Amino acid sequence: LNSGNTMVKNNIGACYSRKGDRKNAASSYASAAGAGSEVKYNMAILDIRNGNYSSAVSNLSGAASFNEALAKLLSGDKDGAMSTISASADGATAMGAYLKAVISARKGDANGVISNLKEAISKDAGLKSMASSDREFIKWFADANFQAAVK
């Protein structure tokens, strides 16, 4: 095991991150810089967890993934988040549809909330209970279409 190898440092950072040690994870990722896209991705996940959304967006730039869309949403770019998740392979998953519903909620788009929740729930019925109490959808809790989707 070569502790000076940047990929090893990246993997050590991932281990620290899984253990919840964000400080050492960040240090390991920083020393692994230049080792490839995996390092930037791991740094971005840490950035999201630490609330550094603009840095996460930068580290995920061009990834067209769930996490890039999430980082954009959390940084306030609702349209960018929707474009990113819609263009990604993740957009066709249950969680991708759920994220689209959250983005729609933040945009005030009732039709988007309902249609995306229905799609998400059709792919993973377990999302019904999550959606029924998710504060992102509080504006729609009394809406008959929302209630029908999550029952």
Which role does the model predict for each range below?
Residues S3, G34-S37, S61, D90-T93, ...:
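Short coil turns that delineate tetratricopeptide repeat
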Residues R18, R49-N50, L74, R106, ...:
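Register position in tetratricopeptide repeats
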Residues S122-K151:
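Terminal, low-structured helical/coil segments at or just beyond the last alpha-helical repeat
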